[in-house]
C-alpha cells in the first residue's frame, strides 16, 4: 500500500469448486478538483507450495525499548485529581507493584470536553504546568515508575489553539474529515510536522520517561486519506 497512488483497496472474497478469489484491487477516488491520480502500483507474484512463504514480510526490527516494555506492565491511567492519583499509585507501590509503565490518558490534558491533542499545556484543573511537573517528578523520582503523557496527532478539536481549517484533511467533496467525537482529522503531513514541533516542548517542560501515542495504528491508512488537491500526495493512502 505504500508503493501506490491509489486511495483505497477493495476486496472480493469468493470460494467455489471452480474458482477462488481473494483480495481485489485498488480504487482511485477523484480529488477535490475532480481529477484522479495517475495509476501507479507495484505487484509481486510469488509461487510456493507452502502458504506461509507467499505472505508479505514487512521489516519489524526489535524495539530499542524492549528491555522496558518487555519487563513491565502497562497501565493507561484515567488521570483525575492529582492528589488522589498520587495516593493511588503510592498504595500500588506499597503492594509491590513496581515494574509498571504508567501513562495518563487524554484526561491529563483536559478537564472537560476541551481539546486533548496538539497541546503543550496540561489541564488547568490539574494544576497546569506546575501541577504536571510536580506529578511527573513524584511518579518518577519518588515512586520510581516509568511515566509519561498521552498524545495523538489524529484527532484535532476546533477549540485548539493551533486550529485552522487548512490543518484538516478533506473528503472528495471538499468537506472537513471527521475523527473522534468533537474532533476532525488532521492532514497526515501535519501529524509529522506537529509531533516534531510540540513533542520537544513537552519533554523539555516535564522530563517524562515514556509517552503513549494513541489511534495511529488503529486506523487503516485508507480511512484517513486527504483528498485536498492542493497538497502533495493528495488522494493517496500512501501519504
What are these regions (language model features)?
Residues 1, 99-239:
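Aromatic- and carboxylate-enriched substrate-binding clefts and catalytic-loop regions
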Residues 1-114, 120-126, 138, 142-147, ...:
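Carbohydrate-recognition beta-sandwich/jelly-roll modules
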Amino acid at each position: 500500500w505504500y508503493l501506490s497512488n491509489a486511495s483505497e483497496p477493495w476486496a472480493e472474497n469468493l470460494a467455489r469448486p471452480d474458482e477462488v478469489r481473494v483480495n481485489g484491487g485498488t480504487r482511485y477516488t477523484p480529488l477535490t478538483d475532480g481529477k484522479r491520480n495517475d495509476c501507479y502500483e507495484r505487484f509481486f507474484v510469488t509461487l510456493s507450495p507452502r502458504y506461509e512463504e507467499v505472505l508479505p514480510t514487512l521489516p519489524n526490527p526489535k524495539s530499542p525499548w524492549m528491555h522496558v516494555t518487555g519487563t513491565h506492565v502497562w497501565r493507561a491511567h484515567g488521570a483525575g485529581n492529582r492528589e488522589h492519583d498520587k495516593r493511588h499509585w503510592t498504595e500500588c507501590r506499597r503492594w509491590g507493584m513496581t515494574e509498571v509503565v504508567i501513562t495518563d490518558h487524554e484526561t491529563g490534558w483536559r478537564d472537560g470536553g476541551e481539546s486533548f491533542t496538539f497541546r503543550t499545556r496540561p489541564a488547568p484543573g490539574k494544576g497546569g504546568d506546575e501541577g504536571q511537573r510536580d506529578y511527573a517528578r513524584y511518579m518518577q523520582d519518588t515512586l520510581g515508575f516509568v511515566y509519561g503523557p498521552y498524545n495523538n496527532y489524529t484527532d484535532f478539536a476546533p477549540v485548539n489553539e493551533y486550529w485552522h481549517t487548512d490543518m484538516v484533511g478533506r473528503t472528495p467533496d471538499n468537506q472537513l474529515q471527521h475523527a473522534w467525537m468533537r474532533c476532525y482529522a488532521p492532514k497526515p503531513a501535519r501529524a509529522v510536522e506537529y509531533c516534531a514541533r510540540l513533542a520537544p516542548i513537552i519533554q523539555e517542560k516535564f522530563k517524562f520517561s515514556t509517552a503513549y501515542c494513541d489511534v495511529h495504528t488503529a486506523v487503516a491508512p485508507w480511512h484517513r486519506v486527504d483528498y485536498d488537491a492542493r497538497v502533495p500526495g493528495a488522494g493517496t493512502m500512501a501519504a
